[in-house]
Amino acid sequence: MDKRRNLLNISDLTIGDVENITKLANQYLEEKVENSHVLKNKIVINLFFEDSTRTLASFEIAAKSLGANVITLPIKSSSINKGEDLKDMIKTLNAMNPDYMIIRHKSSGIINTLAKHVNCSLINAGDGSSEHPTQALADYLVIISHKKQIKNLKIVICGDILHSRVARSNIRLLKMFGAKISLVAPPALMCKHFSEVDSLHYSLTEGIKDADVIMLLRLQKERMNNNSSEKEYFHLYGLDAQKLSHAKPDAIVMHPGPINRGIEISNDIADCVILQQVKFGLATRKAVLHYLINV
């Protein structure tokens, strides 16, 4: 099998790639794709070493709707639990000649390492706190649908920046298109090392002033060691209607899910464009699978 292109990080994409994927995703949303079974007779293996509802279901539905044969391996009963090395497992699966492997793993950077041992297309469905490129592509599509362009938009990413792969991928992608990016987080959850970020804030109301887009992040308790008060977090960093009034009147509020209601966001604004993100995520993953098979 010829070596095909991977999607491991946002840096794998050019502006042209993003625009082409976005165009394809819009065609899938509008049901205007001429050959919707572009993956007929292709084999897609889903390997999710972390729990997932949205991303796993989205990739599985996307691949099946494009005509692929999809195998989602039950990790808890796989050879990994018998002590097999992850690299050996990937090499074994690669020997079966799949066309794609879609992998989620708790270890940052691991998928870049695994890519050296496969000759199929490899897609990163989230690796630790490193990257989640298809989520960023879906978020880009949502923002474009509301704001038409990214350049000079004030986009505020708020919450658990330190542990967030969604934040990292969005920062890198949105900056490619000229966004002005601000981060809001408690000091213990802030990450100060992004050259692409324009400003850091420790106050939510200060950070979202005149924001065009507010992107909230889940508080990732599974990656944290302390037990900070959820009530205190919501008081300081949870978004409600009163705090939202500091943003622009037409600001959109996003969240990659799953939502912790009453922690990151109040019930009265929790249903903003979040389900649209899910819908656009499915179209985006169809577009990515379609695009990678042709490059």
Curated annotation (Swiss-Prot):
Its EC number is 2.1.3.2. GO terms for molecular function: amino acid binding; aspartate carbamoyltransferase activity. L-aspartate binds at K82, R165, R218. Pathway: Pyrimidine metabolism; UMP biosynthesis via de novo pathway; (S)-dihydroorotate from bicarbonate: step 2/3. GO terms for biological process: 'de novo' pyrimidine nucleobase biosynthetic process; 'de novo' UMP biosynthetic process; amino acid metabolic process. It comes from the Bacteria. Gene3D superfamilies: Aspartate/ornithine carbamoyltransferase (3.40.50.1370). Keywords: Pyrimidine biosynthesis, Transferase. SUPFAM superfamilies: Aspartate/ornithine carbamoyltransferase. Carbamoyl phosphate binds at R54, T55, R104, H132, Q135, G257, P258. PROSITE patterns: CARBAMOYLTRANSFERASE (PS00097). It catalyses: carbamoyl phosphate + L-aspartate = N-carbamoyl-L-aspartate + phosphate + H(+). GO terms for cellular component: cytosol. It is an enzyme of class 2 (transferase). HAMAP family: Asp_carb_tr. Belongs to the aspartate/ornithine carbamoyltransferase superfamily. ATCase family. Heterododecamer (2C3:3R2) of six catalytic PyrB chains organized as two trimers (C3), and six regulatory PyrI chains organized as three dimers (R2). This is Aspartate carbamoyltransferase catalytic subunit.
